[in-house]
Amino acid sequence: MSYIIGISSFYHDSSVAIVKDNILIDYLKEESFTRIKGNSVFPKRSLLHLVKKYNLTNSKIQACVFYEKPFLSWSIITLFSLKKPFERWKISSSQFKKLWSGSLSFSTHTKKILNLDENKNLYAPHHMSHALTAISFDKKIENKDRLIFVIDAVGDGETI
């Protein structure tokens, strides 16, 4: 029996998902605890609630996955800023701040809250995270061939 924790935070609604033996078993949005609509902070309360509910320990957790690759995002924001620096500065500077204070500190949060081994922190491709979410919530497409088309603003630089 192994558990995988999925975490989304720092940009949109923060949330935590728990997968047990490849099946999504639970999901919580941080706003359920903070009562702040669209809360983007690290979902500490949701994470602690689910860890307690399922009695999760380091030995039971196979991985803790973040929904993007922060260093890839960093390089994309940098390239984006260089193309039109004066027009993009306001957007890029706020994204850099979010990235620096958020995504890059993901493993610090999991270590502090879960006492999780560093090698259990994984970073998923952003658009793959969207696609897997679609599969998890639509039982009609389970175990079938499928094409999932993700349209997103920036993601991992794979945007059309």
Question: Residues of each region from the PLM?
Answer:
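Short acidic/glycine-rich loops and adjacent helix/strand connectors
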Residues: 1-160
